[in-house]
Amino acid sequence: MVDWDKEAQRFRQRRQEAEKQEELASSEGQADEPSDDPGLSQALPQKHLGLEDKQQGLPNEEEAKGEDFAKDQEQKHKKTFNHRKYINWTYLSRSKNKKLQLKSVSWSRLILAAAFLFMIIFSAFWLSPLNRIATIEVSGNNIVPQEQILYGSGLRENMTYLGIESKTGVVDNRLKQLFPSVRSVQLNAKGNRTVEVNVQEFRAIGYVKKQDFYYPVLENHIMLDGAIPYLDQDIPLFTGFEDQELLHLANQLSKLSDDLLAKINEVVNISDDNYPNHIALKMEDGNIVVGFIDSIADRMQYYDQIVSELEGKTGVINMEVGSYFQEKNPLNDPFASPEEKASYQEKVDQAKEKSKEKQAKADKHSSESKLGDKPKPRGEQSGASEEVTSSQRQTSSQSSPRPGTNSSQQSSTVTQTRSSNS
């Protein structure tokens, strides 16, 4: 590539040198020419004389010398300044400008043509069926049905496919106003003219049963108005709670994980005047957890660890103050029916009466034995002792087995000795 700036600079330097040489040559030539000034003619009379001689056609040596000097200067000027190069450089500078002008014109025309072609192609695609929605998919919904989400979003088939993701904000606000369970909405263009409506909902914490229908309770403390005829999720059923207590319970249970929440089958309100906010949780593995609403979320975090230590046993896990295990019976089971509790209480009362009767008999027998052990006079004590020793001998002799005697005979002799002693 030619560096045009350097070449132009060299061209200027050469031209300046040539101009200087021309000025020197012209100044030397002017010194030889005659002057019209009369003062100068008086000061230099010899030149006037020479001029007169020239006019008269007389030969002059100085004129010949001047002509020779002019020829020498002209030859030197030809050697130092090359007129061919000067002309060529001028042509090159002009050709450079023409090339730049041609390049700029060609690029501008090319850009305009490309932009015009792009507008034509884009307009054709925008109006063609390739820019129309063919399929709409819904994902992430567990509470709101798919048909309601499609209808509420306002999306329809044959709508413009290009730029559909920019409508996410409009669809998100529309679905949030229609359905309180919707947390956020995202539109995704999946290709092949398919649009995905990705819905994120608030988690359902449990259900409330009213007139054979179930109403979901969300983690954002909202109970939905839409009823369902059956339980379709692994979440507990809330029984016996007022609205304020229900919101308080939902706030606490929202802190539990999905796995732990799925292990709870039912939550019952067992509070009274002495124990407000008292609840019982019926677990899927057969255990029953008793505690308070305010602290149940923190203490249920250790439920799996407690169950692993029980080694398969089931019962009542009390989490009111600390945590301890009890064997389950109808009296400490909040989910037992009144009939079961009454029958179990009757059995307990009967067992208590029997134990009391046994205790009374034992006390009576001990009192009689104490009365029989009162001290007697010495004569009576000696006679009694002799009778006791003799009777003991007889019983020992009778109780000793003899050959040919059976067990029935031995038992009869033992009873006879007991009667004689009495």
Swiss-Prot record:
Function, as annotated: Cell division protein that may be involved in stabilizing or promoting the assembly of the division complex.
Chain positions covered by the region annotation Disordered: 1-77, 329-422
Transmembrane segments: 110-130
Family of this protein: Belongs to the FtsQ/DivIB family. DivIB subfamily.
GO cellular component: cell division site; plasma membrane
Pfam family, one: POTRA_1
Gene: divIB
Side Extracellular, residues: 131-422
HAMAP family: DivIB
Membrane topology: Single-pass type II membrane protein
Positions with biased composition (Low complexity): 389-422
Key word Membrane present: yes
InterPro entries assigned to the protein according to its UniProt record, in alphabetical order: DivIB (IPR026580), FtsQ_DivIB (IPR050487), POTRA (IPR034746), POTRA_FtsQ_type (IPR013685)
Location in the cell: Cell membrane
Compositionally biased region (Basic and acidic residues): 1-23, 62-75, 338-379
Domain named POTRA: residues: 131-202
Organism: Aerococcus urinae (strain CCUG 59500 / ACS-120-V-Col10a)
Designated name of the protein: Cell division protein DivIB
